[in-house]
Amino acid sequence: MKLVAVDVGNTSTAVGLWSDGRVSRVSHCDGGFDEAKKAALALARSSGASCVAYVSVVPKADRAWRAFAKARGLAFRQVTYRCFADKKGGKIPLSSSNSKLQLELGHGRGLSIDYPKPETIGADRLADAVGAVSRHGAPLIVMDFGTALTAAVVTRDCVWRGGVIAPGFPLMRDYLFERTAKLPQMKLGSGRAPKIGRSTEEAMRFGALVGYRGMVREIVAELRRNFGEDFRLVATGGFAKWVLRDLDLPFVVDPTLTLYGAGLICSREF
């Protein structure tokens, strides 16, 4: 099965071809809907894909993408908690609080959700967790380094237990510039922190890099203490490689994880 996988984030949109469990021909579009639409249309035409696998954290974009798919005769499947079935295999009731949901992935794998209000879980977090369990196995912590930093915890029994949401690195970087009178816009640079700041920009870079990596390290340590599990560590998102460089934790960086998870979910019949 071939799908055009679309991941709409707060600052950019990723578009890629999902075909029989593999993601290829990925475009990262920073120019808004028109640029991403062109990339998706080109993929659909050249690959013969029949469906859009859609994951979004921007609700106002949903209608435009649904209309795009309809206008071109493509099926439209959107990642939500309703892609999961209840424990009896039936449809999820409208009042879903405290329900236990699951998605079978084949080959004896699956992901269950044990969460008070599953309808509040971000679609990207669901796609990340499903993709990570399929590719890397449980138990794991999967972190998505985007505009926000999100983390999902999947325990050894393949159950999504909850997660963490924190400001993403670009929010930290931009807020210093926007909310102070004299601090400059910080450049990302190589991702290596200086030994100490010997200029304003170096001081900002040291604080941002060392401080942010310290936050990531402490989140992982606290989750390991709370659950008593030696979690695998999986990372995705546009800032993952940059933030994790030189961090003394064994993260596997998986750049196409969200697209892969979206395709995997939407390739199921639901």
Report residues per predicted region:
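N-terminal glycine/serine-rich phosphate-binding loop of ATP-dependent small-molecule kinases
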Residues: 1-84, 88, 92, 100-102, ...
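Gly/Thr-rich phosphate-binding beta-strand-loop-beta motif of the actin/hexokinase/Hsp70
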Residues: 1-24, 132, 138-160, 176, ...
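Glycine-rich phosphate-binding loops at beta-strand->alpha-helix junctions
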Residues: 12, 55-64, 206-209, 229-246
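Adenine-nucleotide phosphate-binding core of ATP-dependent small-molecule kinases
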Residues: 27, 192-232, 250
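Active-site regions of enzymes building and remodeling cell-envelope glycoconjugates
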Residues: 70-77, 116-118, 248-256
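Active-site neighborhood for divalent-cation/phosphate handling
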Residues: 81-90, 107-142, 148, 161, ...
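Glycine-rich phosphate-binding/hydrolytic loop that grips phosphoryl groups
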Residues: 89, 181, 251-270
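Glycine-rich phosphate-binding loop plus the immediately following alpha-helix
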Residues: 121-123, 127-137, 162-205, 210, ...
